Regions:
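Active-site-proximal alpha-helix that buttresses catalytic centers in soluble enzyme cores
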Residues: 1-320
Length: 320
């Protein structure tokens, strides 16, 4: 990204706050359209807010241009990632775009919220999806029904760790003896291997719970994979859930991010905003061989526990 070295004069157009949603973007436009639909629904729920949308890649409006426009026309911009896991895009590209906009419009306050993250509201969605799956199965017996939480996978171990936490929480708050984690790419284990293990352990039914906000190429691939597994294991009943971007908890989480930023709640800002590890990443060639777990102290005094061997793949398609 090219950093603007000369500041733009302060804006003189529209005052007030702008909420800028940042979606990942997908090569499959149906996924981008769902994010647009989410934005429209959030505007309808919160008509007092000025809510705008941008994408990191694959769809307009593009993050950098949208952020500069918001900074030009607002007194304050609240940047809220509509993204589940904090991998390279959340830790690198979004904070860099925010820094550019701050340089260009120093008189505009720009605040960056955390991603949605692994949290109780997301767990509530997973539990509800699992109950729906069990109600649809012929034999809703949790002792013979394996569960697979299926995420997109990342080269960032912190993002994968959040997925592992969600799978563990789902296990501890339910009656299922097997709740496993699988990934569609980048890392392991993959869905096919996890299902193979569950069948060998005697599971007669398998519930696949995609950990995705919106549709796209990877959600389409997941449904094809489950169809293949049905053919491979005709004695096993499979249920594949859907993505969960329009659940009420997602709107409530976005509301909370905005409220926390406005109130200045501690830890309401993304830890990677202003993080020095990204400067080191640039020296290493834009971060293609540095790992970063962001294990922050609870009080977050910006004393980061960094392990700089994070591998960031800049174009891992499909939002998570």
């Amino acid at each position: 990204m090219n950093i603007m070295m000369q500041a733009v004069p302060p804006h003189s157009l529209q005052a007030g706050d702008t909420i800028l949603i940042v979606g990942h973007g997908s090569r499959e436009d149906s996924g981008n359209q769902e994010i647009r639909d989410f934005t429209a629904q959030w505007r309808a729920r919160r008509p007092e807010l000025r809510i705008e949308l941008c994408f990191i890649e694959f769809a307009p409006p593009e993050l950098n241009a949208a952020l500069l426009d918001a900074a030009r026309t607002s007194q304050r911009v609240l940047v809220v990632p509509l993204i589940l896991n904090a991998a390279g895009h959340v830790k690198m590209e979004i904070p860099e775009a925010v820094e550019q906009a701050r340089l260009a419009y120093p008189h505009t306050e720009i605040l960056l919220a955390p991603h949605l993250s692994a949290c109780d509201p997301i767990l509530a969605i997973l539990k509800r999806r699992l109950r729906k799956a069990m109600n649809a199965l012929d034999m809703p017996d949790p002792t013979s029904t394996g569960v697979v939480v299926l995420g997109r996978g990342s080269s960032d171990r912190g993002a994968n760790g959040e997925m592992a936490k969600m799978a563990r929480w789902l296990l501890e708050e339910g009656d299922h003896e097997l709740v496993d984690l699988a990934f569609t790419g980048i890392t392991w284990p993959r869905l096919e291997k996890v299902v193979q293990r569950q069948v060998l352990l005697g599971m007669r039914q398998v519930v696949v719970l995609p950990y995705y906000l919106y549709t796209g190429t990877l959600m389409q691939r997941i449904h094809r994979q489950v169809e293949h597994l049905r053919s491979q294991y005709p004695q096993v009943r499979f249920f594949c859930g859907e993505h969960f971007g329009f659940e009420n908890e997602i709107f409530e989480l976005m509301d909370q991010r905005v409220a926390d930023l406005r109130a200045g709640v501690p830890d309401s800002r993304l830890p990677c905003d202003g993080c020095s590890y990204r400067e080191i990443a640039h020296d290493l060639g834009h971060g293609h061989s540095h790992a970063h777990t962001h294990e922050h102290a609870p009080a977050h005094d910006h004393a980061h526990d960094h392990a700089h061997d994070h591998v960031h793949h800049p174009h891992e398609d499909q939002p998570a």
